[in-house]
Amino acid sequence: KLLHRRVAGALEHAFAADLDPVSAQIASHLQLGGETRGAIAYYQRASEVALRLFAYDAALALLEQALTLVHTLPASTAAIETELELQMRLCTAWAAVTSYLGKETERAYTRALELCQQVQQTPHLFTVLWGLHEVALYRTDYRASVELAHQCLAIAEELGDPGLLVEAHHAAWGPYYFMGEYDHAFAHMRAGLDLYNRQQHEALSADFGVHDACACALYESALVHWSTGRLDQAVVWLERSVAHTRKLTMPANVADADAYAGLIYHLLRDPVRAQATADRAMTVSIEKGYPYTRFLGSVALGWSLAAQGSTAEGVALARQGMAASEEFGQRLHHSQLAAMLAEACLLAGHPVEALDVAEGGLASFALYRD
């Protein structure tokens, strides 16, 4: 143990100017040296480095190590607060890895809420409620989602924080859209857009949805206009979203906005632009390991290729994306993904498969209003 403590000390001295690259090594040596609290602090630091690099799998492993050590500490308020800080980072990492669809994500946010309730005052309650709203939204429990969104809005209004207000409105417009309550959705989108500042608020996406609030408001505005038959306005709002996307700096935000643009260009019957945006979404998603935007982009890209004559390649891509979506437990937009795959199958000369896929999409919409 003494040797490990000495190695940790030597690393701290040698890399004093920048401890980030060796923080995981120091944590490991401190753990083996019996310095539990020091090891926890360095595992936390190493996880923050991994999160900044979008290395979510590495962050998860480091956070699990830290949490295992926290659970060996004597019960105290300080231990609860330390666990909560780690749990919040675990929520961020799981949300990115599973796009709020995995059971791990729901467990992480549920545990974080339990910890928040054990601490008298915490700035994390808003973030936890927001995460639980997103979990509810992705499982298509729209009423629960909107109720949690309004809890977020009450906290944001009490604090008067512009960034939290942006994200509270962001939480509300999604479930209202899927419930078909378009006036409420528009009201929250307008309020969020009025407050949004890219330099200040894009980075919030790491904790709030793994996508940019402004891009979401713009492309969902396009969806509302399309849903209500105002196709010209749908084009205008989608073009605003695409222009905004080119200014974004975080890869997850770019992948999300481009993937949704691909879906909406399908609705607008524009396979050329669907191909361009879906291809960008796929490129970023594959490079960074984003499953949700990867399968959205795959189906949209497949449809766009089939619609332009590359039917074999297109239907193969669309099938791959649909299979990944179903394996992942995706519900939102499942019926549109089915429509794109069905059309690609029809164009490729597979009418029986097309009919089967289309019937599955109709059943999905009947169940989830997705």
Residue ranges and their predicted role:
Residues 1-129, 135:
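Extended alpha-helical scaffolding segments used for macromolecular assembly and cargo binding
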Residues 6-9, 87, 112-114, 153, ...:
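Helix-coil-helix junctions within alpha-helical repeat/solenoid scaffolds
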Residues 14-20, 33, 53-55, 73-77, ...:
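Short coil/turn linkers that connect adjacent helices within long alpha-helical scaffolds
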Residues 125, 130-132, 136, 140-151, ...:
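Hydrophobic or amphipathic alpha-helical targeting/insertion segments
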Residues 179-199, 209, 213-214:
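Solenoidal tandem-repeat scaffolds enriched in leucines and small polar residues
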Residues 36-40, 48-60, 75-78, 92-107, ...:
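Short coil/turn connectors between adjacent alpha-helices in alpha-solenoid helical repeat scaffolds
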Residues 44, 57, 61-64, 84, ...:
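Surface-exposed alpha-helical interface segments used for non-catalytic interactions
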